[in-house]
Amino acid sequence: MCTVCGCGGHSVEDQFKAHLKSQGKDGAHKPAPFAVLAEPQGPHSHSHSHWHTHADGTSHAHPHAHSHSHAAGHGAEADSDHPHAHGHDHGHSHGACAHDIHLGHGPAGTEVPGMSQARLIEIETDILSKNNQYAARNRAALAKNCTFATNLVSSPGSGKTTLLVKTIEMLGAQPLAVIEGDQQTTNDADRIRATGAPAIQVNTGKGCHLDGAMVEQALAHLPLPAGALLFIENVGNLVCPAAFDLGEDAKVAILSVTEGEDKPLKYPDMFAAAGLAILNKVDLAPYCDVDLDLYEANIRRVNPQIEVLRVSARTGDGMGAWIDWLRAGLARKAR
């Protein structure tokens, strides 16, 4: 997560209020303004672990924390104004910069000017503890309803929404609902609603991820029959969402074959937190000069226990295994 992520107040679109407002007295449809429930939030912080991979291939994790305010956006980038020590030798070349900058070696996993590592860890503990309270309430409510919830996380453009649309089509009469997270617009929620499935859009504004409180608010306005599947499509971001429990049963990390085989090593936190990785757009592999086996190997370097599925949401290849995984998860919740 960035040192100053600029998370702002979020809004949850209530599709039913929006629908009612879209109709005039004569019953004719008119363009509907967004009906939103706004919840401005005060100062807070985020945290999670960061992985660091050395040139010799060894990897290890660091905790990470930072604080910021929800009251306003931030326009400045974080920078470091102090020297940084390294415990290993560097070669020197006069033709190029010989020293990389690593800000994650301290106990807190990051550096913020004017703030000690101890204070960063204190903030980390506080914000995650509060989020976990919301997540626990969500988890209890979903368990009571025998709902299997997945938190879909990825970079922007990995194909999450296309995968969801295909999934909904293949599930047929299976009860389900979707929470869509984006900074702005209802584009993805509109695509989901076009399939006939209920969906709520959560616009996070300056926020770079969903959190437990946002999901709790969305659930209050989403019809969710007993025994349903719940899909939470998080904001496109491979860093920040890794730290935040939403009350889901599993995080599902989605990776497009166009993103590069080393993506799991460069952004390991999410793959370490996920129970399933979906390697999407495999139909493009022959045109991208990529090694699918290397993708899987790098994912498992970060998380040896993770399950990996190769899927093309466009052609349907591999989708059967994904549907089976969802139904197995739902069956476990019903026991």
UniProtKB/Swiss-Prot annotation:
Region spans: G-domain: 149-309
InterPro entries assigned: CobW/HypB/UreG_nucleotide-bd, Hyd_mat_HypB, P-loop_NTPase
UniProt key word Nucleotide-binding: yes
Disulfide bond sites: none
Keywords linked to the UniProt accession: GTP-binding, Hydrolase, Metal-binding, Nickel, Nucleotide-binding, Zinc
UniProt keyword Cell inner membrane, yes or no: no
Chain residues that bind Zn(2+): 208-209, 240
Biased composition (Basic and acidic residues): 76-103
Compositional bias ranges of the Basic residues kind: 61-71
Region of interest called Disordered, as start-end residue ranges on this chain: 36-112
One GO process term, biological-process aspect: protein maturation
Residues the record lists as binding Ni(2+) 2: 208-209, 240
Signal peptide residue numbers: none
Any GO molecular function: GTP binding
Residue numbers binding Ni(2+) 1: 2, 5, 7
Function: Involved in the maturation of [NiFe] hydrogenases. Required for nickel insertion into the metal center of the hydrogenase. Exhibits a low intrinsic GTPase activity, which is essential for nickel insertion.
Family under the similarity heading: Belongs to the SIMIBI class G3E GTPase family. HypB/HupM subfamily.
Protein name: Hydrogenase maturation factor HypB
Species annotation: Rhodobacter capsulatus
